[in-house]
Amino acid sequence: MNLKALRATAAERLQPGDVYAGEVTSEEAWQILEAESDAALVDVRTNAEWAFVGLPDLSQLGKEPARISWQVFPSMAENANFVGDVAASGVADATPVMFLCRSGARSRLAAIACAAAGNTQSFNVIDGFEGPRDGSSHRGTRAGWKAAGLPWQQA
């Protein structure tokens, strides 16, 4: 799929009233990261998730994911400095940025916040790093970054 069509599909997935650029799958996020040299991935999960579940590995693209928690572990209070932390990581307002969490919920909130602050190219990775639970209540097998076979590493 070309990037123009991919972006159009991502925008079509938005819920009424959403103001960010779109909803992309993990595979689509990878395509954007691969095709656009300035595109960035912000992993909004917690330190515990990065340490125990793993991280996307963007090394073959010459990139690293920015690790900026949307919620701070263990209290899970919202990171009041999130938008500023994203800007401090080098993500400019016009930079295509993919926000990733476990399953697409926290990353959606992150995309909304950054879009409201001026980044018109904020995307939510809808299936997350691990995706939904399967019939055995395990994550990482039905959808998401890991299930798609995209590169990842244990932290």
Predicted regions and their residues:
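Short, surface-exposed ligand- or partner-binding patches at beta-edge/loop junctions that are enriched
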Residues: 99-100
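Rhodanese-like catalytic fold shared by cysteine-dependent sulfurtransferases
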Residues: 1-40, 47-96, 107-155
